[in-house]
């Protein structure tokens, strides 16, 4: 009846177009679905049929259910009794962790999956190895050990502000939302590298509007990464949670644009030698050279800000928050850590001496164990099988297949880490630690390892050392009974990491 009405009501040419589209699109989808299920080269790889049928199944778990597709893999491996499962039409996940070295070794021909990273930005989204090397080499001096050593005074200043805000909250009998404190701290550090001018996020009594906007955006990150145009349309619907996306994105981008403009203005007005090194300085210096090859590859600061802020803020702040949760949930761990910090208080309390802090064995063990158990980037980071294909288990994966080995598959593997859900820094100390560093993969490995690894370790070590050297703390009821998180490309805590400060051991004050 509907087709008949359309035929009578609409002009002949328009009717034919609509009828053709109405018939061809569903037919094409059905044919494509049949191919994926019964004729695709991966048809014999076990896994959920809906995953084999369409990528929408991953989107369902990531955004609609909001728990994370990657959190389902372990039960599917067990259900299908297979170390290899098909998780998408052209995507496979494996728990054969020995392949991690094959994929990430120096000179690897396993490229990043273009279809997965197409809506990402910044350094991590670059597929071409030559372009990636050019961009990374351009930025690498900002993240070298020498450069990070130069950030210790900035870290010291920010921690002093954290300490002041923490004692003020304690004096007023209020709990401290460590998630927000740590997010502010991590963002402050990455902005210091992004811009040559100083940007203060500590001026607000509560939470900086820029960070609040960023938090709203990250809550919908799977929608942005999967279907950015749909995200734009849905954000225009009033009265929904998504309606906050548009103003949040506007706040975020307006702040970034204003900082870029102000930084550029100051650089034009100042002598080059007086300007602190940063992403921004390096980009504007590049504009006045003949390095056309670099110019065509390296994006403007505004285009890379979101990816660097997301990568440099959420992962580090989340991991540090997890450290607080696990340390305060483990009295014996807390006692051992505090004892070590007390014995070395002179280079924590009287200004941070990072060269000495980074040598503390139990602190390092706590950091490594936190990185392992918290799994800061829990989901797929797929690589494309190179020419010739590869056999994994009893399945041949042809060239072009997207293969993933998630951090969870390694960090929570009980053959590598016995009792993987138990927080045990001792596993990283002494004879028991032999060979474990190989599986410390929180920042990746090889040429595509996270460029901010050294900076992240600075933050993790210094924050934990400072707070647990200075304050006696306890978790509040808001933390729940266990560590609960969701996969929003980076892991996000479901429960607020909130602490009550019992005393300031440096001043002797009790609250």
Swiss-Prot record:
Chain positions carrying an annotated carbohydrate: 81, 344
Gene Ontology terms: biological process: biosynthetic process
UniProt-annotated binding residues for heme: 450
Disulphides: none
Membrane topology (UniProt): Single-pass membrane protein
Cofactor(s) the protein requires to work: heme
Role this protein plays: Inactive cytochrome P450 monooxygenase; part of the gene cluster that mediates the biosynthesis of fungal ergot alkaloid. DmaW catalyzes the first step of ergot alkaloid biosynthesis by condensing dimethylallyl diphosphate (DMAP) and tryptophan to form 4-dimethylallyl-L-tryptophan. The second step is catalyzed by the methyltransferase easF that methylates 4-dimethylallyl-L-tryptophan in the presence of S-adenosyl-L-methionine, resulting in the formation of 4-dimethylallyl-L-abrine.
UniProt record similarity statement: Belongs to the cytochrome P450 family.
Keyword line: Glycoprotein, Heme, Iron, Membrane, Metal-binding, Transmembrane, Transmembrane helix
Name of the featured protein: Inactive cytochrome P450 monooxygenase cloA
GO terms under cellular component: membrane
Localization, UniProt: Membrane
Miscellaneous section: Even when expressed, does not show any monooxygenase activity.
Ribonucleoprotein found in the keyword field: no
Residue stretches spanning the membrane: 17-37
């Amino acid at each position: 009846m509907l087709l008949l009405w359309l035929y009578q009501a609409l002009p002949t040419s328009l009717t034919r177009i609509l009828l053709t589209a109405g018939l061809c699109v569903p037919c094409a989808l059905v044919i494509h679905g049949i191919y994926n299920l019964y004729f695709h080269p991966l048809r014999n790889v076990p896994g959920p049929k809906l995953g084999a049928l369409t990528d929408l199944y991953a989107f369902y778990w990531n955004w609609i259910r909001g728990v994370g597709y990657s959190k389902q893999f372990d039960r599917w491996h067990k259900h299908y009794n297979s170390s290899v499962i098909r998780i998408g039409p052209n995507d496979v996940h494996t728990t054969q962790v020995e392949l991690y070295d094959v994929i990430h070794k120096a000179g690897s021909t396993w490229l990043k999956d273009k279809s997965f990273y197409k809506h990402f930005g910044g350094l991590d989204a670059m597929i071409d190895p030559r372009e990636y090397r050019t961009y990374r080499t351009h930025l690498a001096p900002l993240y070298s050990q020498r450069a990070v050593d130069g950030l210790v005074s900035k870290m010291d200043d920010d921690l002093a502000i954290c300490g002041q805000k923490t004692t003020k909250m304690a004096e007023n009998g209020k709990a401290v939302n460590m998630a927000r404190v740590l997010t502010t701290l991590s963002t402050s550090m990455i902005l210091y590298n992004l811009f040559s001018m100083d940007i203060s996020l500590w001026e607000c009594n509560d939470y900086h509007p820029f960070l609040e906007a960023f938090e709203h955006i990250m809550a919908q990150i799977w929608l942005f990464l999967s279907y950015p145009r749909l995200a734009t349309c849905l954000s225009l619907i009033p009265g929904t949670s998504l309606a906050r996306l548009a103003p949040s994105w506007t706040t975020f981008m307006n702040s970034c644009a204003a900082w870029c403009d102000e930084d550029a203005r100051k650089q034009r007005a100042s002598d080059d030698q007086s300007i602190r090194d940063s992403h921004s300085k390096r980009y504007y210096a590049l504009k006045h050279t003949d390095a056309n090859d670099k110019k065509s590859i390296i994006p403007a600061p505004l285009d890379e800000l979101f990816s660097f802020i997301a990568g440099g803020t959420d992962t580090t702040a989340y991991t540090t928050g997890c450290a607080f949760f696990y340390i305060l949930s483990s009295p014996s761990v807390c006692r051992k850590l505090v004892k070590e910090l007390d014995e070395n208080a002179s280079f924590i309390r009287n200004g941070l001496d990072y060269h000495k802090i980074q040598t503390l064995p139990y602190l390092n063990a706590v950091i490594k164990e936190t990185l392992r158990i918290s799994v800061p980037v829990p989901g797929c980071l797929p690589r494309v099988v190179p020419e010739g294909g590869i056999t994994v288990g009893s399945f041949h994966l042809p060239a072009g297949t997207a293969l993933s080995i998630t951090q969870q598959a390694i960090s929570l593997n009980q053959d590598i880490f016995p009792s993987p859900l138990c927080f045990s820094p001792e596993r990283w100390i002494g004879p028991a630690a032999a060979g474990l560093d190989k599986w410390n993969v929180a920042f990746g490995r090889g040429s595509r390892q996270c460029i901010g690894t050294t900076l992240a370790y600075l933050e993790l070590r210094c924050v934990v050392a400072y707070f647990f050297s200075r304050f006696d703390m306890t978790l509040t009821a808001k933390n729940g009974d266990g560590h609960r998180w969701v996969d929003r490309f980076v892991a996000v805590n479901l429960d607020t990491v909130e602490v009550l400060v019992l005393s300031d051991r440096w001043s002797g004050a009790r609250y």
